[in-house]
Amino acid sequence: MGIEVISILVGGGNNYMHLFYDDDAAFCVDASNPRILLKALGINFKKSIYDEKEIFSMGEDRKKRRELVYLFTTHKHLDHSAGIRCISEESPNTKTISGFSGDICKSGDKFRFKDVEIECFHTPCHTVDSFCFYVGEKYLATGDTLLFLGCGKFFGGTPGQMIKNIEEIKKRVNHDAVLLYGHDYSEQNIRFTEEFYHVPEEIKKKKFLKLAEEIKYNPFFNLKKVSIEGSEEEVMGKLRERKNKFSKE
């Protein structure tokens, strides 16, 4: 796959925007801050993770600004979708793709960026319009469906839907694919996971995990290991409730 990806922390430091790019073109997942995105199109990157202050301070070559081919949005919450209108106005040739605005996608839809295929997975639960985007069989941009050793709150769905989402992802996604999350909640989620079992130091040092690592260590993938009684759906629901309370502590 002849493209690179950077992740930009915006919105106070825990929202991720993901920009896939080569020398002359790019596509983005979740334009949380469209001004940062537009500036990033003209920057030569030296690492894989930046915060928005770093992007603001970097030099930009407007003559070599990359063409923004697609803007994919994982769900309608404004901390992920706020940039759609601005990008549509500033970059009218950009194709905006989501489950709720612009070009409405459905599960199984595929788009091409150069020689890279991007497949849409409908993953309703956090919201009814939640999608993950599978990029070149190497990355899965998950929005708030899956997070580092966690998953999103069930605002628009049921525990059964999250179980189904996880099983579909396990079945359809390369287990060596890297998950690109919608937020950096890694520290909190590590602490929560260690209420049930130990998380190795090499996992704690990472910001993004492979699917195989999530399968092994994410408690929402391991419902039989969390010492909660009930059916599979009941355990998923109780685990999510316990995580909600943990987040407020």
UniProtKB/Swiss-Prot annotation:
Positions bound to Zn(2+) 2: 79-80, 144, 183
GO molecular function, one term: metal ion binding
Positions of substrate binding: 183-185, 240-243
InterPro entries, alphabetized: Clx_II_MBL (IPR035680), Metallo-B-lactamas (IPR001279), RibonucZ/Hydroxyglut_hydro (IPR036866)
Signal peptide as annotated in the record: none
Metal-binding as UniProt keyword: yes
Subcellular location: Cytoplasm; Nucleus
Cofactor note: Binds 2 Zn(2+) ions per subunit.
Family per record: Belongs to the metallo-beta-lactamase superfamily. Glyoxalase II family.
Protein name: Probable hydroxyacylglutathione hydrolase ECU02_0580
Organism, as annotated: Encephalitozoon cuniculi (strain GB-M1)
